[in-house]
């Protein structure tokens, strides 16, 4: 993997890679160090307790948060496959059938009819998958809602409710061992774990009875892994506040977790847009495309030789006609690389996948805009290289700014908040 590939991955705010870099490599170590520093202002013992709790909390939570949802979804997909359904069938295709005229370019019935004409085995298998879902829509929707519930509820319960209880129990045990010289009549609060039976009953009941309306099921099916992580982060906030050892710790957890959600899922998107807009204005270039595209020699050569083929317009029909009829065009290849469209091994578009027309239209606009800007420059190759370097710098700057806010500003602000509400620098739960 090249440096450009790595930068491209961490610059994709729709994926988990930016979260992985910020959370594990920068945010967690910084939070641990700040927690130790602030608690040491009160005592070394509290600093040790805070450090241990923070190490367990940060890294175990990161492992569950970043790995839990993808892992559960993978298991759920295997389960759905064993039941005879292909989890690649996007439920949004049912909603597309309601469109009329030139706006109707995809859908369950539409795709079955359109792609049945192909004799390729992978296409016929895909059509068979569509027919199976069409004939058993209610059953398939239940599988999708169960998948969503499992992928969000299970990690959230573990991170938000189980882990804090275990962490607090460990701290109490350490304190008991530390204070063995105290009189025997000094009582310590016992740890009450979550009721396993109750959790099991809850999970079975939810997976048996949970039913969402078609529209909501379609919305759920459209959620990316990073969207589900944001939802689980909201549940994590509720869990951390509700399991707090006292109200002061609850206030601090609410302050910390809400700030973290904003800085993880909202701020980076606006920082990226702002940096790209600033770069376009300052350097008179176009940095809206991904670095992988800007670094592609075939793409640059095609611009120089005026061999780039594009859809006639941004209309749904023109876009879909183009990607279906010209799968080997640079536009279609990059659309697939950027996950705007998916092709089967035979080169035919996968009829089970939903194509976000608005997203594809925006991509076409950015693609065309860069080509026009490059042609207007005196040196296309130099223009593209400059755009790539600036885009990479923007991505790294975004990671740096976001990480500074998450790993430096937020923890410092949290301890200022704790000092303001408690009069002490130590974590409220360690009182």
What is each stretch, according to the model?
Residues 1-431:
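Glycine-rich, hydrophobic membrane-spanning regions of integral membrane proteins that mediate transport
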């Amino acid at each position: 993997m090249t440096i450009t590939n790595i930068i491209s991955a961490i610059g994709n705010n729709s994926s988990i890679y930016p979260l992985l870099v910020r959370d594990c490599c920068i945010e967690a170590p910084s939070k641990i160090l700040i927690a130790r520093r602030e608690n040491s202002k009160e005592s070394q013992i509290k600093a040790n307790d805070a450090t241990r709790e923070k190490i367990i909390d940060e890294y175990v939570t990161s492992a569950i948060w970043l790995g839990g949802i993808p892992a559960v979804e993978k298991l759920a997909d295997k389960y759905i496959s064993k039941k005879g359904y292909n989890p690649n069938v996007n439920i949004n295709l049912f909603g597309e059938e309601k469109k009329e005229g030139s706006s109707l370019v995809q859908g369950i019935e539409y795709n079955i009819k359109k792609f049945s004409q192909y004799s390729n085995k992978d296409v016929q298998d895909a059509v068979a998958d569509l027919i199976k879902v069409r004939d058993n829509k209610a059953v398939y929707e239940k599988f999708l809602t169960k998948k969503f519930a499992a992928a969000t509820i299970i990690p959230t319960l573990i991170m938000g409710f189980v882990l804090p209880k275990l962490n607090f129990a460990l701290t109490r045990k350490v304190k008991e061992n530390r204070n063995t010289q105290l009189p025997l009549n000094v009582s310590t609060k016992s740890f009450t774990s979550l009721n396993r039976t109750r959790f099991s009953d809850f999970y079975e009941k939810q997976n048996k009875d949970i039913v969402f309306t078609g529209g909501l099921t379609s919305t759920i099916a459209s959620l990316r892994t990073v969207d589900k992580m944001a939802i689980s982060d909201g549940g994590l906030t509720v869990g951390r506040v509700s399991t707090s050892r006292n109200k002061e710790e609850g206030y601090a957890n609410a302050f910390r977790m809400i700030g973290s959600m904003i800085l993880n899922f909202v701020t980076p998107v606006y920082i990226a847009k702002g940096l790209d807009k600033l770069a376009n204005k300052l350097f008179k270039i176009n940095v809206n495309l991904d670095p992988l595209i800007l670094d592609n020699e075939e793409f640059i050569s095609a611009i120089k030789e005026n061999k780039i083929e594009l859809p006639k317009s941004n209309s749904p029909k023109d876009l879909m006609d183009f990607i279906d009829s010209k799968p080997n065009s640079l536009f279609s290849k990059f659309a697939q690389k950027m996950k705007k469209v998916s092709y089967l091994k035979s080169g035919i578009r996968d009829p089970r996948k939903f194509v976000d027309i608005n997203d594809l239209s925006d991509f076409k606009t950015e693609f065309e805009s860069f080509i026009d800007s490059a042609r207007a420059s005196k040196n296309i190759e130099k223009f593209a290289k400059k755009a790539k370097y600036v885009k990479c710098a923007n991505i790294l700057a975004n990671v740096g700014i976001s990480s500074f806010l998450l790993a430096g500003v937020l923890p410092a602000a949290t301890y200022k908040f704790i000092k303001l509400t408690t009069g002490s620098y130590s974590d409220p739960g360690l009182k």
